Amino acid sequence: MDIEAYFERIGYQSTRSKLDLKTLTEILQHQIRAIPFENLNIHCGESMELSLEAIFDQIVRKKRGGWCLQVNHLLYWALTKLGFETTMLGGYVFNTPANKYSSGMIHLLVQVTISGKDYIVDAGFGRSYQMWEPLELTSGKDQPQVPAIFRLTEENGTWYLDQIRREQYVPNQEFINSDLLEKNKYRKIYSFTLEPRTIEDFESMNTYLQTSPASVFTSKSFCSLQTPEGVHCLVGSTLTYRRFSYKDNVDLVEFKSLTEEEIEDVLRTIFGVSLERKLVPKHGDRFFTI
């Protein structure tokens, strides 16, 4: 596995930059704008693999995306390979309908330490919840970014990531009550501890998430990719584009329903994804917002 191939995949011109916050931010932003957050394998009759070799083959060689356990595993590998001080962490995602965090460790994120200062880096939450810059591991500090204001809070050794969102304007009234729209301005995202993890810690959950009828990943097919101004999302056959801050403190959210033929074209042109097997788009009833 070649780091230069990874750089080419994310469109990053490596000059063997310093191992500083600027380089870390650039790599994160290049990855989230080149590598989609997606679960399409599940809905093409394929599996979501966890081994680094399989992930590299899928994302770098085949120019696909992946879900958090894959895209953040790849990011962890790349940052470690470059010489950053990295720690793999595990997260518990907030379930809005149940009003609680997941009991299982279903999210992978990365801690990076630069000159004694700790940051959280995550390229695998997608949609409008995706951070665009590393977050300082500081409790109670509002950290404004283009997508929203992020806030980390620590209580008794557990960290909580929350998001303060803008208002949103949906010009197409047909979708004004879409179940894909986030209704909360203050949104809990996930919790985590600083206990170091290995990829093996996620194996059972990786299987569960792609096989259980209770999993949102089996309920909905999705693909999400950040742009310099916003984020594209395809959920089932519904395409959305959110433009952050199109007006003061307001996001613009555009919706479009696609035909089966249009889905293939959109995946190729907007997300850069060409599938080897036929996708069966799915928009089940599990809670999932963009």
Swiss-Prot record:
Enzyme class: transferase
EC numbers for this chain: 2.3.1.5, 2.3.1.118
Molecular functions per Gene Ontology: arylamine N-acetyltransferase activity; N-hydroxyarylamine O-acetyltransferase activity
Catalysed reactions listed for this entry: an arylamine + acetyl-CoA = an N-acetylarylamine + CoA; an N-hydroxyarylamine + acetyl-CoA = an N-acetoxyarylamine + CoA
Residue positions binding CoA: S103, G104, Y208
A GO CC annotation given for this chain: cytoplasm
Pfam assignment, any one: Acetyltransf_2
Binding-site list for substrate: I106, H107
Annotated consequence of substituting N99I: In allele NAT2*9; slow/unstable isoform
Location in or out of the cell: Cytoplasm
InterPro entries documented for this protein: Arylamine_N-AcTrfase (IPR001447), Arylamine_NAT_domain_sf (IPR053710), Papain-like_cys_pep_sf (IPR038765)
Active site feature: C68, H107, D122
Function recorded in the entry: Catalyzes the N- or O-acetylation of various arylamine and heterocyclic amine substrates, and participates in the detoxification of a plethora of hydrazine and arylamine drugs.
Protein name, entry field: Arylamine N-acetyltransferase 2
Protein encoded by which gene: Nat2
